[in-house]
């Protein structure tokens, strides 16, 4: 794609209204932070929030203007999210689903919100979702992007 066409595409993406009211990224490592950066750069959400157990990543992302809000506690920022991106290790997904289910039960989230995971294997994710929600949620989109190089974490995002 020529530079001129790319600039037109970028310009048109930035002038369209956001697709989402609020996106919540759970996990600000390489993949989660890369998704957050792409969402921010392309104006895809009116509000972008994140959860990460590593508080300095949240603080830095807010200071850099990447996030509108963030916390180590999912319940602090998830309310009203219409897209949730789960970017945590596979073994942590069950606990994330517990928190998401609690937010749905408390009325903080719509039961049909879109959820996607960017974890590696899918069998454990699907089994955990079925166990937590009783069946596979219609808004769950299992995925796994190819990302990265020799670096990891928030600073490795592009």
Regions found by a protein language model. Give the residues of each.
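NAD(P)+-binding Rossmann beta1-loop-alpha1 motif at the extreme N-terminus of oxidoreductases
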Residues: 2-79
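Short secondary-structure boundary/capping elements
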Residues: 53, 69, 92, 150-151
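Short beta->alpha hinge that forms the Motif I/post-I loop of the SAM-binding pocket
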Residues: 53-54, 88, 118
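Conserved short alpha-helix immediately C-terminal to the canonical SAM/SAH-binding motif I
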Residues: 57, 92, 122-125
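Rossmann-like NAD(P)-binding element
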Residues: 74-114
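Rossmann-like NAD(P)(H) cofactor-binding subdomain of soluble oxidoreductases
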Residues: 99-152
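Ligand/cofactor pocket segment of small-molecule handling proteins
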Residues: 155-158
